[in-house]
Amino acid sequence: MNIEITESQFKKMFFSIMNILFPNIEYSEKQDGNKGYDITSDGEIVFRIYKRGNVNELFIPENTIKTIIDFIPQVSKKPRLLSKLISSFINEKTGLEIFSVEFWMLDSDGNLIDGNLMMRYNYKQ
C-alpha cells in the first residue's frame, strides 16, 4: 500500500516532532561579540542566527541536524525541504524572519555526506 503525504501534513508532523525534540525554545542576543541570536532548548544551543546587516542567517549545528535526522531519516534525502521546514519552525517560535539556512548535511546514518557538504539555501532576494 502506498500512502501519499501532502506537504502541509508533513509540515504539521515535522513541527510536532520538533516541539518534542526541542521543547522550551528561547532566544537571546549572542554573548560572543558577533551580531545575532543563540536559540536554546532547555539551556542547550540548538540553532544560531547571525545578522548580516538587516538579514538573519540561520546556522544549524551538526548535533542538531543529527538529532532531527535520527527521528526523521527521510529528510536527509530532501535538504531543501528540511531547510524550509526548519526556517518556518524558527520563524514561528521566535518571530525572526530567516533569509538563509546553512547546515552540514548528514546521511541517515549520521555521517557527513561527501565528507563535508555544506548546504545553504536562500529564501528572499
Predicted regions and their residues:
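Compositionally biased low-complexity segments enriched in polar/charged residues
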Residues: 22-125
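Short acidic, low-complexity intrinsically disordered linear motifs used
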Residues: 1-17
